[in-house]
């Protein structure tokens, strides 16, 4: 699971002692005054709007993330022929606004045709199921079909090969059932047919662990249900690092079923993968009041973000109920947040004491740098409440240069900020 905190950088072993004195760590380095503020929503965090939401353009400085579905049959229509043009265009559009994408792959949507590729629909023995879901005719894939199973794995493999390190992509959501939310709460749910068997799902988890090296993929918290997923029976699958999303966040009884689902994956699962989701649509009241400063149902948004270590949340309707300034403010309570508590320099060496004052880690490698010289310690390992001394040595380091936080997984216009009040 989560690696132990390693704090060796460049050529020196550095201390993680939170109480640094003149007789302690780097006492022979000269402290350099440093002041900085976090003024913006940080990359890869915050409230997410659909890529089609006009506010993604007109208020683009208030958010960092955009959301979209991607349909399997938009990319593949013939066997082993993958046309990624729709995905490339989507990523390009989102990045042009200085944002990154949260994408979800899905087959089934209430009231719509199934997004299984046409060639599979014509496959011998394939029989799609139609049924009523929320009163509308909805189509479900035939998971008995071995070609569908093979395609599903191949799709994610090809996607990872192409986009795993693409800075335009923040997070990937995937799954099965209605909206890929890991349930068919209303409609023809037949395990092994309209919903994949536990055996295939086990294979899927293991293969996904092989496909992705950098991108943190996520599944719904509803996968905690022993009926739908093999995770209860095969607890070792929980050792695979993945994130979760909760698509009814903050509804009235969220502290019951939803919390149980979150805790099933482990109280500290946020250390391995991001926690995200969507504001509840259980009632209009939920959408209208989820970001109210005074909260709803006795809970504020910020308190729930802290409790569940949330990094992002889809809130596409929120511009209709809240100001973009409030949306920005709420977004800034999510995810990681760095503070530099001490900055010391000696010749071409620097020592930076940095802490994570946020509610979650950053899920991509990021590094403290001084004068273009990076420390070796990745801030991806810095959990909330932890702090670490980072030692930097090399040409370019001086007391005239302020530290920066460098990350290769950013699009033009993005910057990781930090708080500092070193005197």
Q: How would you label these PLM feature ranges?
A:
Residues 62-64, 97-101, 165-170, 212-217, ...:
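Short, well-ordered coil/turn segments that N-cap beta-strands
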Residues 23-147, 264-267, 271-322:
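N-terminal substrate-binding region of glycoside hydrolase catalytic domains
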Residues 176-274:
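Substrate-binding cleft/loops of secretory-pathway carbohydrate-active enzymes
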Residues 1-4:
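Positively charged n-region of N-terminal signal peptides that target proteins for export
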Residues 128-194:
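Active-site groove signature of glycoside hydrolases
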Residues 66, 94, 159, 172, ...:
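Conserved, mostly hydrophobic/aromatic
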Residues 14-15:
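C-terminal motif of bacterial Sec signal peptides marking the signal peptidase cleavage site
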Residues 332-423:
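Extracellular/luminal regions of secreted and cell-surface proteins that mediate adhesion/ECM remodeling
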């Amino acid at each position: 699971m989560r690696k132990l905190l390693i704090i060796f950088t460049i050529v020196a072993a550095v201390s993680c002692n939170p109480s640094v004195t003149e007789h302690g760590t780097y006492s022979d380095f000269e402290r350099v005054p440093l002041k900085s503020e976090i003024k913006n929503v940080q990359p890869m965090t915050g409230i997410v709007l659909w890529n089609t939401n006009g506010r993604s353009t007109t208020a683009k400085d208030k958010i960092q993330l955009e959301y979209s579905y991607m349909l399997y049959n938009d990319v593949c229509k013939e066997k082993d022929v993958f046309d990624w043009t729709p995905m490339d265009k989507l990523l390009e559009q989102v990045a042009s606004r200085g944002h990154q994408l949260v994408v979800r792959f899905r087959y089934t949507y209430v009231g719509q045709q199934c997004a299984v590729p046409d060639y599979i629909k014509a496959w011998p023995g394939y029989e799609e199921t139609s049924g009523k879901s929320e009163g509308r005719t909805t189509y479900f894939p035939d998971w008995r079909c071995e070609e569908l199973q093979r395609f599903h794995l191949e799709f994610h493999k090809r996607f990872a090969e192409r986009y795993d390190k693409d800075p335009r992509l923040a997070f990937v959501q995937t799954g099965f059932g209605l909206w890929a939310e890991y349930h068919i709460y209303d409609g023809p749910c037949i395990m092994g047919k309209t919903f994949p068997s536990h055996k295939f799902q086990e294979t899927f988890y293991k293969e996904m662990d092989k496909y992705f090296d950098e991108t943190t993929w996520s599944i719904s918290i509803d996968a905690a249900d022993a009926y739908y997923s093999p995770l209860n029976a095969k607890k070792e699958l929980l050792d695979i690092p993945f994130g979760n999303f909760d698509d009814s966040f903050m509804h009235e009884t969220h502290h019951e079923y939803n919390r149980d689902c979150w805790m099933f994956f482990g109280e500290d699962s946020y250390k391995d993968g991001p926690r995200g989701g969507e504001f509840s649509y259980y009632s209009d009241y939920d959408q209208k009041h989820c970001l109210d400063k005074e909260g709803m149902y006795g809970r504020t948004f910020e308190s729930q973000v802290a409790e569940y270590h949330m990094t992002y949340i889809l809130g596409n309707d929120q511009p209709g109920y809240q100001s973009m300034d409030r949306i920005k403010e709420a977004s800034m309570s999510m995810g990681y947040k760095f503070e530099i508590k001490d900055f010391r320099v000696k010749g071409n060496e620097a020592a930076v004491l940095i802490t994570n004052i946020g509610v979650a880690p950053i899920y991509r490698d990021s590094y403290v740098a001084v004068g273009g010289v990076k420390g070796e310690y990745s801030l991806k390992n810095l959990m909330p409440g932890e702090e670490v001394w980072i030692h930097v040595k090399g040409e370019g380091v001086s007391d005239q240069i302020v530290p920066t936080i460098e990350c290769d997984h950013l699009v033009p216009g993005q910057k990781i900020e930090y708080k500092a009040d070193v005197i």
